Amino acid sequence: MKHLKGLLLPALLALASSAAAKDPLVETTPFKNELVNLMYFDDSGVALVQELDNGKIFRSHDAGKGWKEIKNVKGLGIMKSPYDNKVALILGEKKHWITFDQGENWDSFETELPPSPQSPVGWHAQDNKKILLNEIENCFTAPCLGRTYYTTDGFKTDPKVLVDNRRMCQWAKASERFLQGMDKHDDRILCITRGKYSDRSKDFRLLMSDNFFKETEEPVMSSGRTVQGMANMAAVKGYIVAAAKAEHSSELALYVTQDTDSWHHALFGDHKIEEDAYTILESTNYSIQVDVMTSKYVTMGNLYTSNSNGTYFTKNVEHTNRNEAGYVDFEKIANIQGVVLVNTVDNYKEVEKSGQSKKLKSRISFDDGRSFEKLTVKGKDGELHLHSVTNLHNSGRVFSSPAPGIVMGVGNTGEFLGKYTDGDLYVSDDAGLTWELALEEAHKYEFGDQGSVLVAVFDEGDTDEIRYSFKHGRKDSWQKIKLDYKIRARELTTLPDSTSLKFIVYASRKKDGGGREHVIVHLDFSDILKKCGDSDFDDEWSVRKDADGDPSCVMGHKQLFRRRKWDAECSIGELFKDPVPKFKPCDCDKFRDYECDFNFTPAGEGKEKKCEPGESFSLPKGACDGDAKSYKGSSGWRKIPGNQCKGETERDKQVERECKDAERPRPKTDKITSEITKFKGSNFMEQYYLERNTQSDGKDNERDKDETVVMLTDERTAYITHDHGKKWKKAVDDEIVRIYPHQYETNNVYFLTASKKVYYSKDRGLHDSINSFEAPVMPNTDMLPIMQFHPKQKDWIIWLGGKNCEKVGNKDCHTVAYVSQKNGEDSSWESLVPFVKKCAFVWREAGRSVKEEQVFCEQHTNEEKNAPLELISSDDWFKKKDVKFKSVVEFATMSEFIIVATKAEDNTLRLDASLDAHTFAEAKFPPKFFDIHQTAYTVLDSSTHAVFLHVTVNPQRDQEYGSIIKSNSNGTSYVMSLAAVNRNSEGYVDFEKMQGLEGVAVANVVVNVDEVNKGSKKKKQSRITHNDGADWEPLQAPEKDSDDKPYDCDVANREKCGLHIHGYTERADPREMYSSPTAVGLMLAVGNVGPELSTFGEANTFMTTDAGITWKEIKKGTYAWEFGDQGSVIVIVRRGEDTDHVYYSTDSGAKWDLYQFADHKMRVEAITTVPSDTSLNFLLWGKDSKELFAVNLDFSGLPEFQKECKLDEHDPTKGDYDLWSPQHPLQQDEPECLFGHVAQYHRKKRDVKCRNGQRIDQMHDIARNCSCTRRDYECAYNYERDSSGDCVLVPGLSLPDPSKVCSNKNVKEYYANTRFRKIPLSTCQGGTEYDKTGDVHPCPGFEEDFQKNHGVGGFTLFLAIVLPFAAAGGVGYWVWRNWDGKFGRIRLGEPGGGSAFDSDAPWVRWPIAAVSGLVAVIAALPLVVGSVWRWVAGRMGGGGGAGGYAGLGGSGYGRAYTSRSSFARGRGEYSVVDPDEGELLGDEESDEDV
């Protein structure tokens, strides 16, 4: 139990009580160890407590007077049901206990793994036998996912597994007010689980089930679509709130439901909600209250309150005080509606600017937060300030208890809140309206007997006194209990409802002989006071706030309590009976009792607030029919549901509204529009899309409608547009030399000057959000990447600058790497290492278990400028460094593996790979590669659980070609996939994966290798694979061209008359791709039909809609293309000659229409749209005589796109979509079986007129797995395919001894050699399993284990085989981008938004679900939760990354594109990732580098 050490005692969460008189009874019980989890069962005298060091649990049945150990039970923590006062759980490592009679009897049950450290138990609010139990999450491969069990009989029978791969689960009825009194959804459970086919956090889904996940439903949000990227959820009063996080953004979308059937998108006006930056607070029965952090580095927030259905949030308080853990100084006074205490930061400007320490002031509201005022002390001028939730000194609520109107706190008078130890104890008996000094010095305090007794104990050191008052704590009413010893109080508590006259003080005292012992002091005031009579009560006490002394109206009524008079020295003595208020209705008030009606949006605040029709506003039935000019409709206001005010106001009445304002304004035109903007300059240097969070449906959310592009011209002027190029403005008024968008946070962008000044925005340049910081030194001048970003910690930046480089030619000029953990702000730069070529953060979401601080750098040996490079590593910002490799040419980090190219003594390259950034293993290449002088590698792709690597065979200029080899699923053993693949001198390879589909790729091969080796020109043909490189074949040419004429060769003979298309090596713009991730199965290309690929000038434009099986020629000549609205519209524009028009198709290329965008011809260089291809806007970039231009094309006005497409996942073909399954052209039997399964994708029906809108999840389902056939296998290591397609041993090789793997002591068995290995993507089952043809044998010494364990599970195999070989697994979607001209084409993987943190398990310390009114801290639970159990070492975690078209080698600077893709061609799930993946690892020109 050592792992429980260091947990603070704070335990009970909403406790309270009191004490007083002649001689209260005092009983002391000593304990041997420190205590935690002191808690009462509600409405009883039964308490539990736990010893920290050994987990022993003790029970008291008489309110802490006597204690007995519960035999044979030792736990990690205690969880008490918040809804049943007889039920509690003791959680052990694997054995747990439950009681249904307040701990008199305990029944045990077991789980396979220990409980989750974060949220181990889910209680059902209405059935005490229904419980969820969450096991500890597996964070080994990240993001952390775990198993949840359920019971419906209170663990009388063994718990059953609910779901295996969940982020979190809860009952729908997880809070008392949710569906209260409704007889539905009793068994409904909501879980956030792994994606349908992915473990990445961006794919997490919210699923519901009414039959324990035998069947599930994914709820649709207010957009009518399901939402991926679900991060968290919490039950708050009558609401459930779920948070979704978009990829490449820390911004969250909040969704709220009151019944789990319909969900609303919560809108916060202009404010964005970010992960780890908001706290859902204790809310009212009719609204949700959320505190939103205003700055990443300053713990301050703004408090927002929702309307009654949780949709619109308005700001109530600015600059609330928060702490790092997400706790907020906010408390609703218990039992009294409308009274709220907060602490705000007075010097917020100085705190934000210079990090000055905070000056706090306390404020109180009596109208539910609509207005706030100072705290005043009776008879004194000046303000009172109190310590609140961020500085807890006791369990339970901070200020209040169910005792009506009696409030206490520790604080001081003066200008600001001082130190706790300088504070005194203050009390108010009018709910905070006025205060008086109760006791000098800081004290812990409690309320008892509905406020008749107040107890306090000194809290600044040891004391031998306990103080109590029977007169509401008035100054001279405090009496003393003298103890025989001095104690240091740790906790003071009583019954949660504060009705008891018995209290418990948990404390420590000095022991004889040194040291301290722990004691529980029981205080009993029962026999001191007489029982109160009727005359001792005030029957209608209330918070008298109005100027005339009338009770305040909250929610349309006054609240009245029967309360003991302050000077009546008697006890109420109604044990376990909570004070219940009476209500009197008030007259309705138009400001206080109303909110905006449905489909109306609030604008303005306070008395200026208006309710205006929202975008989804629609006319009442029959209104505006015929010639009607007006209609009667809602005033825009409605009475807040649940409000009990009487009478009517003008806001209840319908108003006359004009018909012309009623409907949502249609687009100004039903045609395509274009807008041309001219710019000075000769070239566009860089352009980037900053794509908004596509997760939020944005229907009513103005801040989510922008389509932002930033652009730099060669005049060093940066421009920005928020409407996709209709209007442009200068981004900053300064000379800009580079633009860096943040790879992992699409809201962030950086504008670099030639000096140290850097401009940046964290909100896509919206809302005047462009600020600046000073870099430590000017940018480097060596054409090296200047900025590197962290996949998870979005404010961590590595800056590669130049020192002593101000003067050109200075010999002392060299590179230095710096790091900032504060986005470069507040002079936060630390020096890392000098003389470096590149540095990169190593942490990734997918399973690389390293510290977030881990950095790899390439540094010149001995810090000498021209010395060879070393690969060095550090996880403490290079206070210590570890040299991993010498003579390094290049390294690349992908999502799951790191590869390093080093130069051997014979000048050949060697490739090493690592899974964990610590242990590296040399890659095993096909045997005949050992004869090749390996001069360059290009990493092509690893999106299909295997790495594709191009190894250069002929490096001679203009004659380059090489072989594509493909790895096994852990990236270390390679086999031949395709020989003689074309490459150019910059390391680009003619190879491209089809986006959005598994296993389809196109490559160009050199067919006259022998002649080329003798100096001849290359002849090229195109090849396509439909099974991830196992089989390649020529492309099938169409029978006729676009003029309906046959080609002049026999297209049936594909070898001599195939379709050949131009690839990367010849593209004028390497940013273009054949396909789009959101237009599944569609590809466009330029090429020709014939025996070989001809010149670009002779090419025409072709298209396929079935993933490359059949093609058709769509236009003569070469065109550039873009996909819009996920393939709903395709736009093509003439390339390489002047034009004034584009063609577009809205039916997947069946028909093409012309649109003229200019009155004269201009030269168009490129066409672009948002990376996810979800927009109906496009940009043409080009030159018109001496000016640059950008043309916006807007297709959103077309009638075809006026309604949104309907998609029902349960009946997908019912609406506007079909299901489409890709096929393999060579498979006669079951051609739709690809990779062992039939995949089904959503595709919009060709003839429907609607827009896709919000991005849809293209993959619908894996319909079924297929039986294994030869197509599911490729040749194993040491084997190659012969002309008949069989796998034969490479000539001249003898087979290695398979038992040699037994030399590794972790390996217990081996397979005999087989000729085949399964394609890593394949999920086939049964049939003919070609890779199992070799028998499995035990290693010597493991025969017994072999017999016992045969068929060991995948996870064990993973540990036994992958880790011992330090394998590198290449998984991740890759897209590309181009960085710094030098690095050429980069395909990069996908950053994630995961997060991990080490923390003490909060439930071990705090057994109830709220800390001083804190109901749920969504932001303080990042998306991935780290483990605290002692047996799970280190930081497990999620985040992101992936690999790219990393040319591995070479120094040649390549194309003159100075951008990363110039258009962050991240395209949805394929996204911009590591700049380091863009480099050629080794090259014939690279000798000078080492």
Swiss-Prot record:
Q: Which residues lie on this side of the membrane: Lumenal?
A: 22-1354, 1427-1490
- The residues on the Cytoplasmic side of the membrane are 1376-1405
Spell out the residue ranges making up region: Disordered.
1016-1048, 1465-1490
Tell me the Gene3D superfamilies matching this sequence: 2.10.70.80, 3.30.60.270, YVTN repeat-like/Quinoprotein amine dehydrogenase
GO terms under biological process:
Golgi to endosome transport; Golgi to vacuole transport; protein targeting to vacuole
Q: Which SMART domains match?
A: VPS10
One Pfam family, short name: Sortilin_C
Q: What is this protein called?
A: Vacuolar protein sorting/targeting protein 10
Species of provenance: Pyrenophora teres f. teres (strain 0-1)
